[in-house]
């Protein structure tokens, strides 16, 4: 079950928008059914918005992100519910990150704090409360994995065949792209997303080839009309997977917001953490 939890988490930040050829229609209020008033209607097509969003993503060097993830994993009689919140600052060059993640698994709570800069990879042990400095080889491995994830939002090539499936709407200050789907077509999309974001050479990468079926997937992205940066996303998904004769059902909701884009200038590890962190070598990590 832990392996599948990691697989689900690996794809959280990999979902990006695609586009079709029509211009946007005013967004409909899901409760009242009324169309939102748009003062100046955009003449851009969804494809043009996608190209501009792609170009904007290439200029993105830093951001703050808040996410909430609700997951239920079922395998036979075993059921696991996981609730996670993530608060993160990230700079792409040189790659640096500050992250706080709170998880509730099976009634137990766990908080994980991390810093990663050129000074090293530091993590607060959720059990002891002490800071540890992880081995340099682990730092290199994690930065390599993160580099792949941070590059994925500007790779729109794998979404082209799903273009006609997106609903394209607009509000006064946002473009909204929504995808609702199910079946084999979207199962292949999920496999490609997970494959791009799983570390190569790990056991966790193998189940991506398992029999995966998307029963339901709803994605929604909001894009700022002025900057063309993606502001937030919402994903609901139900999928089943078979591995070695065992059926696993995953129900997942992920919501995320991206703010302070290109405004995070520095991520600095507090001096007391650097001075007092226990160094963990590869040997210690295996124990």
Question: Model features per residue range: what roles?
Answer:
Residues 1-8:
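Bacterial N-terminal signal peptides that target proteins for export
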Residues 8-9, 212:
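Short hydrophobic/aromatic segments of transmembrane alpha-helices and their interfaces
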Residues 16-19:
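C-terminal motif of bacterial Sec signal peptides marking the signal peptidase cleavage site
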Residues 21-287:
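Subset-of-secretome marker
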């Amino acid at each position: 079950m832990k392996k599948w939890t990691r697989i689900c988490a690996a794809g959280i930040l990999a979902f990006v928008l695609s586009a079709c050829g029509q211009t946007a229609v005013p967004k409909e209020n899901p409760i009242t059914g009324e169309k939102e008033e748009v003062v100046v209607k955009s003449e851009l097509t969804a494809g043009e918005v996608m190209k501009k969003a792609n170009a904007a993503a290439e200029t993105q060097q830093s951001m703050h992100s808040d996410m909430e993830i609700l997951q239920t994993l079922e395998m036979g009689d075993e059921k696991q519910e996981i609730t996670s919140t993530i608060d993160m600052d990230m700079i792409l060059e040189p790659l640096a990150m500050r992250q706080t993640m709170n998880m509730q698994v099976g009634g137990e709570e766990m908080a994980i704090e991390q810093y990663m800069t050129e000074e090293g990879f530091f993590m607060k042990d959720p059990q002891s409360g002490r800071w540890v400095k992880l081995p340099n080889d682990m730092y290199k491995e994690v930065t390599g994995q993160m580099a792949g994830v941070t590059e994925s939002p500007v790779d729109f090539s794998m979404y082209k065949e799903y273009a006609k499936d997106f609903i394209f709407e607009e509000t006064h200050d946002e473009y909204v792209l929504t995808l609702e789907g199910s079946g084999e077509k979207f199962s292949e999309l999920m496999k490609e997303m997970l494959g791009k974001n799983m570390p190569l050479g790990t056991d966790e990468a193998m189940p991506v080839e398992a029999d995966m079926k998307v029963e339901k997937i709803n994605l929604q992205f909001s894009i700022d009309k002025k900057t063309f940066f993606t502001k937030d996303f919402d994903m609901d998904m139900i999928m089943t997977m078979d591995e070695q004769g065992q059926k696993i059902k995953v129900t997942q909701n992920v919501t995320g917001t991206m703010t302070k884009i290109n405004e995070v200038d520095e991520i600095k590890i507090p001096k007391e953490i650097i001075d007092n962190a226990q160094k963990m070598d590869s040997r210690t990590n295996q124990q």
